[in-house]
Regions:
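NAD-dependent ADP-ribosyltransferases
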Residues: 56
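Basic, amphipathic "hinge/linker" alpha-helix immediately C-terminal to the N-terminal HTH DNA-binding motif
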Residues: 6-10
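Alpha-helical elements of the RecA-like P-loop NTPase motor core of helicases
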Residues: 12, 23, 78
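Surface-exposed, flexible loop/turn segments at secondary-structure boundaries
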Residues: 12, 46, 75
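Enriched for short, Lys/Arg-rich terminal
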Residues: 1-4, 20, 31, 51, ...
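A short, surface-exposed loop/turn module that caps and links secondary-structure elements
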Residues: 26-49
């Protein structure tokens, strides 16, 4: 079984979202790293998952999935 950890930035973003958006994001995260529109990021380590207009940046270390950041499509890559 995979363990999922969240950065403070990711937790903060999730808390600010409405319940429907939170549900969509948590559902997508629960299926990591097996399903979804997943691509390896270029220039940095890690992967990105597309969930509608949101992007989830994560890394996989053995049985641990680290959620690095979550954000809107246009703004998520600026901090990376």
């Amino acid at each position: 079984m995979l363990q999922i950890t969240y950065s403070k930035k990711a937790e903060k973003f999730l808390r600010k979202q409405d319940k429907a958006t939170q549900h969509r994001l948590f559902t997508a995260i629960s299926k990591l790293p097996l399903e979804g529109d997943i691509k390896k990021m270029q220039g940095v380590s890690g992967y990105r998952l597309r969930v509608g207009t949101y992007r989830i940046l994560f890394d996989v270390n053995g049985l641990i999935v680290d959620i690095i950041d979550i954000g809107n499509r246009g703004q998520i890559y600026k901090g990376v």
